[in-house]
Amino acid sequence: LMIGLLILNMVGVIDDLIRINYRRKFVAQIVASSFLPLSGLWINDLYGLLGITTLSPWIGMPLTVFVAVFIINAVNLIDGIDGLCSGLVGMGALVFGFLFIYNAAWLHAVFAFITAGVLCPFFYYNVFGKSKGRQRIFMGDTGSLTLGLSMAFLAISYAMNNPLIKPFSEGAIVVSFATLIVPLFDVVRVVRIRYFQHKPLFMPDQNHIHHKFLRVGMSHYVAMILILALALFFSFFNIVAVEYISNNIVIFIDIVLWIAFHLWLDRRELIR
């Protein structure tokens, strides 16, 4: 993990200073993510999701790299308004911290709480800092890329069926990604729009969820708070729901709720 974080931190610094081609950043993300399965951390069980349970290393390890890169990009792309990325990651890290404490995974809990703790002062100065007084700070790719890999590490650690990390839990695969539903679902929606509009998939646009909130007349601050509330809702809903219904049904409900929410936003935008 530390090697991967160092790689992405260096790439992020260079990109923030002189810009790097997205293809090179993508390669760096793959290399950094590869250290997770190489160190023995990989998704080895889907817990009945789509009818699939145990995964072989030949499938689970490449899947882990794909998922990690997916999370890194989702966190990077959601960094569009002040406090949103740090808020989502900080809140997600807190949830992971309590989940790992519940499962007596103390080292993972410490890492999760450290991640959340580091983001607290950043969130304050990013949202409430004064630009003229040089007290305001911004994340850039340096922060978003490393935070993305940190969240990928926490999510994959919770998803992995490994008694050395935590006891077996039937809903682990759903719970592990519950805190990341907003950025993950958002990047899927945005990439789909770009694909059908024949636009570059990795170039920025104005189709992210925070852009839609702004277009319906909300301020940056209100949009950020509502998106954080939405992410918190999905987190707790998934954690509770997996105790009563199957993983597949929970994911289906998540997708339906996400689509319904965007249909409501689209209608508000048209009315405005």
Language-model regions: role of each:
Residues 130-135, 189-221:
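Cytosolic, membrane-interface loops and tails of multi-pass inner-membrane proteins
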Residues 118, 147-150, 216-236:
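Hydrophobic membrane-spanning alpha-helices of multi-pass integral membrane proteins
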Residues 9, 32-38, 119, 250-269:
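Hydrophobic core of alpha-helical transmembrane segments in multi-pass integral membrane proteins
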Residues 185-200, 258-272:
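Membrane-helix cytosolic exit motif
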Residues 1-187:
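"…together with the soluble PPM/PP2C metallo-phosphatase catalytic core" -> "…together
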Residues 235-253:
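Extracellular/periplasmic helix-loop-helix junctions in multi-pass membrane proteins
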Residues 21-25, 56, 219-223, 246-250:
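Membrane-interface starts of transmembrane alpha-helices
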